[in-house]
């Protein structure tokens, strides 16, 4: 392999200057003015040419806008209304300082208030019960001591008032069959079909009973539910 050795130039400075002149870019040749009055526009940067011809639609729109403003100004001048003036506020009617006069007829209540008796039953002043009570003779006819019940019986109604009905329910004796049912005791065993029903009998003496009553000893230890065989 052969190697060629380029002889070094005699003057290195002159050689570098020659290389710089050969490699000098084109942008260095353009002239730049440092004292420009205004920054460049987009048209200058992108080389966009403006159209010098005037569009006819622009003039038409301008003329229409001027005509509208002239017509609106003439109508406002005729009506005497200025656009900057605010509409007047409607006056608030003054309220009278003295209180309103209320007649006595307006304060009267035309409805009749109901009255309440001892049983808290609402009745008016002209009910049929009061008319019947005024003309009723308590010494004539079967009376159970209650005017309400007598009033219902006079009208051929087999009914009682609420208070007498509750008293009759409270005084009704209990049936004998219900007492016998209460005395029955039902024994239930663990075996299926081992349900036995018997009537409770008074306690028999210890000598007559087949099995003497032995008191159950008191449990002092906790109940063991495990499956382990218990020690003997």
Swiss-Prot record:
Coiled coil: none annotated. A motif (LXCXE motif, interaction with host RB1) lies at residues 107-111. It is found in: Host nucleus. Residues 69-84 have a biased composition (Low complexity). Keywords: Activator, Early protein, G1/S host cell cycle checkpoint dysregulation by virus, Host nucleus, Host-virus interaction, Inhibition of host innate immune response by virus, Inhibition of host interferon signaling pathway by virus, Inhibition of host STAT1 by virus, Interferon antiviral system evasion, Metal-binding, Modulation of host cell cycle by virus, Transcription, Transcription regulation, Viral immunoevasion, Zinc, Zinc-finger. One of its GO terms (biological process) is symbiont-mediated perturbation of host cell cycle G1/S transition checkpoint. Residues 85-97 have a biased composition (Pro residues). A zinc finger (unnamed) spans 146-164. Interacts with host UBE2I; this interaction interferes with polySUMOylation. Interacts with host RB1; this interaction induces the aberrant dissociation of RB1-E2F1 complex thereby disrupting the activity of RB1 and activating E2F1-regulated genes. Interacts with host ATF7; the interaction enhances ATF7-mediated viral transactivation activity which requires the zinc binding domains of both proteins. This is Early E1A protein. It comes from Canine adenovirus serotype 2 (strain Toronto A 26-61).
